[in-house]
Every structure is written in structure tokens, then in C-alpha cells.
Amino acid sequence: MAIRDIIDLLESQGEWVNRSCTRDRILFGDDQTEISKVITCWVATNKVIQYAIEHDIHFIISHENPFYLASTTLPTLIYKAQKEKEALLKENNITIYRCHDLWDVYPEYGIRDSWANKLDLDFEESHDHSYYRYTHDINMTVEECAQHIINKIKPYHQQGIEIIGDKTQIIHRLGIGTGACTDVFEMYEEGADACLVSDDGVSNWIGVQWAVDHDIPLIVINHMTCEAPGMEHMVEYLSKQFPEVTFTFVSNDYGIYLSLIHISEPTRRSY
């Protein structure tokens, strides 16, 4: 099967995607390559590419841009890293396709719904092509909710979570977003009294400051962690469409840790 066959299926869907200006494109390689194995991942790091090389896989579907930054004014270190990654891909005949705009809100299998399902909370039905989901009354403290989430995200190599605000406050309507689309203002206007946000989806000097002033607790998750379930779920979807192809989700397993260091009062010397 040619890579183009898989891309054509993906690009034939998604009325919410602006195909005249989209992130969903081949970023490197040839769409006519014949393949029998495919990797899905959150981002095609060097480690993911090495996995592809070791397993003779020549097509990677990456949710995020594996080339760091798209610009004509690049830091030299990024420019150099891009060229090194491109050389590695070319040497091993690997094509990378970015599937972002389609998969963010693809029903059931996509990023938004897979994240909500992974959290295993009582969510309302999703609406249209919104990036946001909201729970029914979960009646949990912020700390209880955070611990529940920690238990659900362990497969994605995040070992802790950040809470901003009163951890004893009761959550009734939790709002969650999709990846970096975690706008606390939009979730608040839809009735959320606490928000699960990504580290790339909130700013400390704007969203966090406002949430603190308005008693809206925030639970902060890593961007990768909240999107990985959707890229894992893509394997199930594509396997049904192309049963003759082997699809494998490769996790970005670099590890995300929150270390709690208790600092004691300094010892005062007597002179």
C-alpha cells in the first residue's frame, strides 16, 4: 500500500479543517512509498525515528511538528537540528506526515474525545467541533480530582501533576480542553468552576493570574500527556480502515516528573 492511500483517507474527512491553510501535510518524504507498517506518535523525536529504523518502518504520523519551529529566521541550533533530522529520515527513506487539525476534534478516536475517555469522569456529550468538554457534577475536591488524573495518566510517563489554587475546593463542573487549546476564560464562560489545562495552553501572567483572582482552581498537565491518548487511539481507527497494515503507537517516554522538595528553616549560627 502507498502512503498516499492512508493520507487520502484522512484528508477526505473533517469539514472543520481549512484545507487551504492547514498543519496537516507531509513534512518530509515521498507519499508514493509502499509500506506495510506505520508509527503513530505525539511527536517524532529522534528516539521515535530510531524505533522506526530498527523496525524497518518507513511512515510516521506525528501529531506535532518534529522540526521544532517553522520560520525563515531560525536559531542556528534549531536549523542545525532540523538538517540533521532530515538527513536521518532521508538516509532511511522515512516519510513524516503531520495529522493535527483533523485529529484534534475527530469524533470518538481523536485527541479531545480520547482524552476525556482516558480521564474516566462523567462528561457531557461533546458539541460540534469545540475543543472543550465539561463534566457533570463530579463533587470532588481539587486534590481528589488531581489524584484521579495522576492514576489515569501513568501510561504516558507523567509522574505528577501541578495544582494552582485551593486544593480543598470542591469541583462540580470541570472543564478540559484539547492539547494547547485550554482557554480558562472560555471554559469559565461555559460554567466550569475548575479547569484542567496544559502547560502550553495557559500563561501565568494572564490566565493563571485571572483564575487565582476568581477562585478557579487549575490542574496543569503536560501538553504531550493530554494528546498521547488520541494518537494511541488512532492505531485502532486506522487498523480498521487498513487491516493489511500494521499500525503501532510509539510513546514519547522521556518522562515528566514533579519533585517535591521540602526545605527546612536555615540553621541560625551564634557568634
Give the label of every model feature segment.
Residues I263-Y271:
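A short, hydrophobic C-terminal helix/tail in secreted or cell-surface proteins
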Residues M1-L260, S264:
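Active-site catalytic microenvironments in core metabolic enzymes, especially phosphate/sugar-handling
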